[in-house]
Amino acid sequence: MADNRVNPVPRHVAIIMDGNGRWAKERGSPRLKGHEAGAQSVRVVIKACRDAGVEFLTLYAFSVENWSRPKAEVDGLMRLLVRFMDDQEHELHENRVRLRVIGRLADLPDVVMNSLNRVMERTAGYTDHQLVLALSYGGRTEIAHAARRIAEQVKAGTLQPESVDEACVAANLYAPDIPYPDLLIRTSGEMRISNFLLWQLSYAELYVTPVCWPDFREPHFRAALDDYARRSRRFGGIEPEVKR
Ligand code: IPE
Ligand code: IPE
Ligand code: MG
């Protein structure tokens, strides 16, 4: 069979991990059971990224809008985050993955932030793979935050208004050193971005699967990478992208 792959493995994969609630509902279980089951999919995907050679994995774990959910669900999600850090830290070491977080981190309970900080510090030395958790994250919030930082620099006289260009905005995002996602995967079928990485996804390839997040396994991830490999990324031009 002819291999018509035109793209190499994506350097950065971002995932909207959706469908935990529906997965639980189908089983007659409380929503939190779906979130619990989703933790296993996170482990699977971290390992699959390492095996495939994906350098950056950004997971949408909690949006600024998700604070509007019932308190019991929000509290449960925060507890799960702490548990995930406790249970999975050793796997991050085994896979040599550096943990990062992006979002409005001041919103997070101290107990969550402490556990994230602990794992971030201990994994800070790994350079091959990075896991970026988007927590209390909103794309509009991030861009507004960047605008505020830029305004402060202009006010302080360290930046001229005519120097505010795309590179300047990009430099004031939460994690300016991370390349933009090449591939965005969304599970459980919704065809929307839901305020995720609005700036960074401008030229990402989108892949939506009907599979709910707790059922997402390595073959599903592989299928997304295979699909990506055959996309024609033109970036507004007319020639297929030259191999990087
Ligand atoms: C995604 O699953 C996880 C979070 C948003 C934290 P949902 O909880 O949104 O599941 P559905 O979309 O209701 O099925
Ligand atoms: C997006 O899922 C947020 C996360 C996966 C953390 P949502 O379930 O919150 O998004 P909507 O409400 O379907 O747009
Ligand atoms: Mg959802």
Feature map (PLM): residue ranges:
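Flexible, compositionally biased loop and terminal segments
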Residues: 1-244
